[in-house]
Every structure is written in C-alpha cells, then in structure tokens.
Amino acid sequence: MSLHFELVTPARLVRSEEVHMVVVPGTDGEFGVLEGHAPFMSTVKDGAIKVYRSAGAAPEEIQVQGGFAEVSAKGLTVLAEHVEG
C-alpha cells in the first residue's frame, strides 16, 4: 500500500511518485499523510516536507516556501510557491 505524492510549483512538476508517508509543514503545525487519509486542505508554511519512501526509512527533506496542500482520494498534492533544488 502506498500514497501517491505530487509536489508542484507554478513553473513545473517537481515530483510525482508513490511513497509510504509525507510530513508537511502546515501553518497550524506539521501533519503526516498516509494512504487512506481523510480529505482536507491546508496552507503550507516555509519549511521541510519529509518524504518517507518506506516504513522505517529515513526521510528525504525537501525545502519549500509557502503554498497549499490537498489530501484527496487520489493522494497528496502540494502546490508550493517555491522549492529549493
């Protein structure tokens, strides 16, 4: 079982992949998303998105600046204003 994760900026699609879990720096605090998470939307603050490719794996950190996150039946989409790297 996996979560479909997409990271998008106004300029390009940065990531589109299947992962175990993603932790997002929401403006009201960090939140983790696994497959089957209830749908919701949140604004994203500047910080690191942590991508866990498998259970127990060390996270890959992706620095983002602002944006929105949407969790739906299709997975997690983060629309970031800017992604470093």
Curated annotation (Swiss-Prot):
Function: Produces ATP from ADP in the presence of a proton gradient across the membrane.
One Pfam family here: ATP-synt_DE_N
Alphabetical UniProt keywords: ATP synthesis, Cell inner membrane, Cell membrane, CF(1), Hydrogen ion transport, Ion transport, Membrane, Transport
CDD domains tied to this protein: F1-ATPase_delta
Organism whose genome encodes this protein: Novosphingobium aromaticivorans (strain ATCC 700278 / DSM 12444 / CCUG 56034 / CIP 105152 / NBRC 16084 / F199)
Lineage: Bacteria, Pseudomonadati, Pseudomonadota, Alphaproteobacteria, Sphingomonadales
Family per record: Belongs to the ATPase epsilon chain family.
Compartment(s) where it occurs, according to its Swiss-Prot or TrEMBL record: Cell inner membrane
Subunit relationships: F-type ATPases have 2 components, CF(1) - the catalytic core - and CF(0) - the membrane proton channel. CF(1) has five subunits: alpha(3), beta(3), gamma(1), delta(1), epsilon(1). CF(0) has three main subunits: a, b and c.
Keyword Membrane: yes
Stored HAMAP family: ATP_synth_epsil_bac
Topology in the lipid bilayer: Peripheral membrane protein
UniProt GO molecular function: ATP binding; proton-transporting ATP synthase activity, rotational mechanism
GO cellular component, one term: plasma membrane
Protein name stated in the entry: ATP synthase epsilon chain
Coarse class of the protein's main subcellular location: membrane
